[in-house]
Amino acid sequence: MALRMWASSTANALKLSSSVSKSHLSPFSFSRCFSTVLEGLKYANSHEWVKHEGSVATIGITAHAQDHLGEVVFVELPEDNTSVSKEKSFGAVESVKATSEILSPISGEIIEVNKKLTESPGLINSSPYEDGWMIKVKPSSPAELESLMGPKEYTKFCEEEDAAH
């Protein structure tokens, strides 16, 4: 952890950043805080991600968000078959640093909740885009997905937000 913090502060001091060229076909890029941003996902400015496949949208918090939260120790999630509304809270993440609300980037009906997070909340830290997903939603307004940021926009957003702090 100390090495990670040192690397992050050094990169910030040197204003390092890297991006992946399209010719490498890598599915992710790194912002200057070394957080992973995946291609093929949409991102909210509240640091949630959405993976839309067919009629289902999977939602979780970004690597950037979990980096800032630190070690996640508890997750509060809603029940299946309830509704979420865009930009409204659907749960909370408690870390060793703080408790943060999770805002839904889209509206819809929750069709599945990641029950693994109850027993293993650290999955959000170790695998925010795979095992650490939070809910699966049937979107009620697919057009809401278009208002979210793509990977490049989200990376720039995070860099600007970090520079302001």
UniProtKB/Swiss-Prot annotation:
PROSITE patterns: BIOTINYL_LIPOYL (PS50968), LIPOYL (PS00189). GO terms for cellular component: cytosol; endoplasmic reticulum; glycine cleavage complex; mitochondrion; nucleus; thylakoid. Binds 1 lipoyl cofactor covalently. The modification N6-lipoyllysine is found at residue 97. Residues 1-34 form a transit peptide. The modification Phosphoserine is found at residue 140. Highly expressed in leaves, lower expression in green veins, petioles, and stems, and detected in roots. Induction: Up-regulated by light. Residues 56-138 form the Lipoyl-binding domain. Inhibited by harpin, S-nitrosoglutathione (GSNO), nitric oxide, N-ethylmaleimide and 5,5'-dithiobis-(2-nitrobenzoic acid). The glycine decarboxylase (GDC) or glycine cleavage system catalyzes the degradation of glycine. The H protein shuttles the methylamine group of glycine from the P protein to the T protein. Belongs to the GcvH family. The glycine cleavage system is composed of four proteins: P, T, L and H. This is Glycine cleavage system H protein 1, mitochondrial.
